[in-house]
Amino acid sequence: MKTFTAKPETVKRDWYVVDATGKTLGRLATELARRLRGKHKAEYTPHVDTGDYIIVLNADKVAVTGNKRTDKVYYHHTGHIGGIKQATFEEMIARRPERVIEIAVKGMLPKGPLGRAMFRKLKVYAGNEHNHAAQQPQVLDI
C-alpha cells in the first residue's frame, strides 16, 4: 500500500464566503487558517497547497473578548531608525479593518513560499460586498 500524495494540478479548490459579524477574532482565524491549508480535506498533504479560497465579509464587525478592543496593540516598523509604530485594535478597525483578520490568519499559516501561496487565497472585505460572484462561493458557517 502506498502513501497518497496530492498533486498540485489535481487539487479541487472551492470558494467559500464567511460573515465575520460578531465572530471572535482568534476562533475565526484558526478555522480560516485550517481551511486555507486544506487540513479539512482527506487528501491533505503538508507540502502541497490543498486549501480552498475564502472570502471574509464584514471584517469591521469582528469581535474580541475582554479588554482587547483597547488593550491589544499591533506593532510594525517602517525600516528607519526609531521607526517603530503601534496601533490599538480599535485604531486598526477604524483605519484598515481587513488587516486585523489578515494579520491573525497570516500568523497561523506556515512561513515561506507555501504559506504565502495559501495566504493569497484569503480575500477580506470590510463591508458586505465582494467582487467574486463569478466564482459562485458557497456560504460557510463558522
From Swiss-Prot:
Function: This protein is one of the early assembly proteins of the 50S ribosomal subunit, although it is not seen to bind rRNA by itself. It is important during the early stages of 50S assembly.
Family: Belongs to the universal ribosomal protein uL13 family.
Protein's name according to its UniProt entry: Large ribosomal subunit protein uL13
PANTHER family: LARGE RIBOSOMAL SUBUNIT PROTEIN UL13M (PTHR11545:SF2), RIBOSOMAL PROTEIN L13 (PTHR11545)
PROSITE patterns for this protein: RIBOSOMAL_L13
Complexes and interactors: Part of the 50S ribosomal subunit.
Keyword annotations of the record: Ribonucleoprotein, Ribosomal protein
Xref: Pfam families: Ribosomal_L13
Encoding gene per record: rplM
Superkingdom assignment: Bacteria
InterPro entries on file: Ribosomal_uL13 (IPR005822), Ribosomal_uL13_bac-type (IPR005823), Ribosomal_uL13_CS (IPR023563), Ribosomal_uL13_sf (IPR036899)
Cited SUPFAM superfamilies: Ribosomal protein L13
Signal peptide positions on this chain: none
Ribonucleoprotein in keyword set: yes
Alphabetical GO biological process terms: cytoplasmic translation; negative regulation of translation
Molecular functions (GO terms): large ribosomal subunit rRNA binding; mRNA 5'-UTR binding; mRNA binding; structural constituent of ribosome; zinc ion binding
Gene Ontology CC, one term: cytosol
